[in-house]
A protein has these predicted regions:
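N-terminal secretory signal peptides
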Residues: 1-13, 24-28
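Flexible, surface-exposed loop/linker segments and immediately adjacent secondary-structure boundaries
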Residues: 23, 28, 36-72, 76-77, ...
């Protein structure tokens, strides 16, 4: 009986300790700040209006505003937005564009989703590279300057410098400087690689500048 009594006493003693000190510790647990959202860049240039949205809500962007991992960045009508990610990568968005920063390790690459609008990405070579996902294609980048977005009524990809791989509908093409491809609709394969005409290049770059 003494052994059973000792076990019971220990049990009730443990419960009293947990109730007393657990209650004291609870406010400190509740008040402990949530893990900070990771900042991956900032706004360099803005014409018109732009917004960013994540789990914390929606906010207006202006020059020098921070950009965080998980942000979905959106531009307004006739607006232009320039973002610097880390030290070596810049992203320019044109009219009514939407870009989500899904993953990004500063100056080491990442993954972004372009839902709409035109984009111009300029980056130095990354060991891991950058992937741009869209409803039309997946674009794999390793240090390049390229355009992606609406062009001549289609989704076009054009390389200004470097090289990218464009994959869609289980097919892929590799573009090098001066070359482009089109995806006519979501689910369609990329068209054969060809050099874009100067007027088309100018129109594409003007849509993000």
């Amino acid at each position: 009986m003494s052994g059973l009594g000792e076990i019971k006493n220990d049990h009730f003693s443990d419960r009293r300790w947990l109730l007393r000190y657990g209650a004291l510790a609870l406010p400190f647990i509740l008040l402990r700040p949530a893990r900070a959202v990771e900042r991956v860049g900032s706004v360099e240039d803005l014409t018109g209006e732009a917004f960013a949205e994540n789990g914390a809500g929606r906010r207006n962007l202006d020059r020098a505003a921070p950009v965080f991992l998980g942000d979905e960045v959106e531009t307004g009508v006739a607006s232009r937005l320039g973002i610097r990610l880390g030290r070596n990568t810049t992203v320019k968005l044109g009219d009514q564009a939407r870009l989500k920063i899904d993953q990004y390790l500063v100056d080491a690459g990442g993954e972004m989703t372009l839902s709409s609008g035109p984009l111009l990405l300029d980056g130095q070579p990354h060991r891991a590279g950058v992937k741009i996902l869209s409803p039309f294609a997946m674009i794999a980048v390793r240090g390049t300057r390229f355009f992606a977005g609406p062009s001549n009524g289609r989704f076009g990809v054009f390389v200004v410098r470097g090289a990218v791989t464009v994959a869609a509908a289980s097919q892929q093409v590799t573009l090098r400087e001066g070359e482009g491809t089109d995806i006519v609709s979501p689910g369609a394969p990329p068209t054969p690689v060809k050099r874009w005409a100067p007027e088309r290049i100018r129109a594409a770059l003007a849509s993000v500048s």
